[in-house]
Amino acid sequence: MMRPVIVMAGTPVDTQMGMDCLAAQGVEGVFCSISKDPVEQTAFQISSEREKAAVVTALFREAQAAHGCEQAFIYCNSLSGSVDFDAIARETGVAVVTPLDVYRALAPQYRSLAVIAANAQGAAGIERTLLLSNPDLTLRSAGILPVVLAIERGEEPEELVERHRLPELADWFAAQGAEALLLG
């Protein structure tokens, strides 16, 4: 029988989305939210590497002890880009999967991409991953925390997209040559 998987994200809403994603595949998750809201998450992401590693390592260790977890599913782009999960995986023995793993694999297929992330820390981590995988890639990015706050409040998607003028932003990225838009 498969052991439960740590589901970690920056906020409770994102963490629950990750839990729902795994549950749809019949996989049991262990809820591990880093912060209580996007503002606290951003503060966490700009804390020192040592502080971030200590918090994540402690949560991994708790899940290992309480639930026997051997794997972690990081369901948060900005968190993935701001924490060194490779080092934490080595230290804890937890196998970690993040969105950056997917981006690393996809980057060589493109010449130009656009990135919309929750904040600049998340965008920087995503860009670093993409450029390490494809140094010739042209990137344009935006960090838009108000969009994340609207999602957290449960704003209807159509209203959110219109209010934050996301179609215009996507059109601008496309006009600048972006072949695809990565929503981080």
Where does each model-flagged region fall?
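Non-catalytic structural scaffold of enzyme domains
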Residues: 1-184
